[in-house]
Amino acid sequence: VAAGRAGRRRRHRAAGPWPAGGGEGRRGQPGGQPGSGVPGQKEPGHRHISHLYGLYPGHQISVEETPELAQAARRTLEYRLENGGGHTGWSRAWIANFWARLHDAQKLQENLELLLTKSTLPNLFDNHPPFQIDGNFGGTAAIAQALLQSSAGRIELLPALPEKWREGCIRRLRAKGNLHVDLSWENGRLTCVRLSAPSGYRGVLSCGGVSRELILRPGESIRLDGRLQERLE
């Protein structure tokens, strides 16, 4: 017990000089780590952006629920990129996911293109350098985030669809709650979505400003049109 208390005291002393999380840097970024805009930063374009974990892959920061934090996160990304951020493939992929969560389809597209043109080898391996698979997984994750975002009890379709992706379809995306999603779109608008719930599902489904409650029993499926109205299978 005494050793545990001593260890806690050492950790508290070590953590003492760090800025408290949740604040803002000098340029409106979330504070809490060196490089986030607090005085004394040495690498304003640093590749790690760990203080935005709450934006992606976490869900503590969102455009709808925490707009002020979302705006601060946007400023963080702008500041990092203005100072040379995203110079490794995995970091560029993470940045693309951040923009997807901020519903900025244009910047998502720009960063995916940079990932492919500047940080991808001819065999499609991500170039850190050297090869680092985080960039490959992160790039595909960003594509999925453009098409579907989900948190506990809520699913959003096509939240960050780039203008260049005018039409397409995708199958077997997986939303939180063990929900399988097939969807298609034309002219940048949802045309059809099929949802299957092996374990059952209850939550809210939204797309393009339209929302509806979704209740499915275990093993049940439903097919909806572009306005989220039910269609016959």
Please name every model-derived segment.
Residues Q106-L232:
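Non-catalytic C-terminal accessory modules of carbohydrate-active enzymes
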